[in-house]
Amino acid sequence: MRILGIDPGLARVGYGVIETAGREQTMLDCGIIRTDSGRPEGERMVEIARDLRQLIRAWKPELAAVEKFFFYRSSNTIAVVQARGVVIMTLSRFGLPIVEFPPMQIKQALTGHGHADKDEVLEAVMRELSLETPPRPDDAADALAVALTGWFQR
């Protein structure tokens, strides 16, 4: 199964694509969709949707896993939530099944406890995907963690 993991954001959307076969998981791609902070939010969201469509067409995932947020405390967070809505809409337009996980559930799935720090999650991602070097940037590594959680929680 091919899974696209997404770590939503307005400035950077992390993505990670994994392929699973039996008990093996392989990283196919990871990176970020970066938007220019000097452009209007609407244009940035159009850019996110466009680049995400390209990723979906290129990798043809069978499942999308997206990090879910629960707390909205600042105007910056509102923009992230809006960008997440663009991600969900774009995935839905391709008819992809979508699973969503809050950060604590992702940490639990990868490390066995929901209060893991970033380094513990990164180590788990590297172990599960047999990576010798950490995926960069952090948003891409986070997206791979989301994709792995999608696989583990299926």
Curated annotation (Swiss-Prot):
The active site is at 7, 67, 139. GO terms for cellular component: cytoplasm; Holliday junction resolvase complex. It catalyses: Endonucleolytic cleavage at a junction such as a reciprocal single-stranded crossover between two homologous DNA duplexes (Holliday junction). It is an enzyme of class 3 (hydrolase). Its cofactor is Mg(2+). Its main location: cytoplasm. It is found in: Cytoplasm. GO terms for molecular function: crossover junction DNA endonuclease activity; DNA binding; magnesium ion binding. Keywords: Cytoplasm, DNA damage, DNA recombination, DNA repair, DNA-binding, Endonuclease, Hydrolase, Magnesium, Metal-binding, Nuclease. Mg(2+) 1 binds at residues 7, 139. One of its GO terms (biological process) is DNA repair. Its EC number is 3.1.21.10. Pfam families: RuvC (PF02075). Mg(2+) 2 binds at residue 67. Binds 2 Mg(2+) ion per subunit. Belongs to the RuvC family. PANTHER family: CROSSOVER JUNCTION ENDODEOXYRIBONUCLEASE RUVC. The RuvA-RuvB-RuvC complex processes Holliday junction (HJ) DNA during genetic recombination and DNA repair. Endonuclease that resolves HJ intermediates. Cleaves cruciform DNA by making single-stranded nicks across the HJ at symmetrical positions within the homologous arms, yielding a 5'-phosphate and a 3'-hydroxyl group; requires a central core of homology in the junction. The consensus cleavage sequence is 5'-(A/T)TT(C/G)-3'. Cleavage occurs on the 3'-side of the TT dinucleotide at the point of strand exchange. Homodimer which binds Holliday junction (HJ) DNA. The HJ becomes 2-fold symmetrical on binding to RuvC with unstacked arms; it has a different conformation from HJ DNA in complex with RuvA. In the full resolvosome a probable DNA-RuvA(4)-RuvB(12)-RuvC(2) complex forms which resolves the HJ. NCBIfam families: PRK00039.2-1, ruvC. This is Crossover junction endodeoxyribonuclease RuvC. It comes from Synechococcus sp. (strain WH7803).
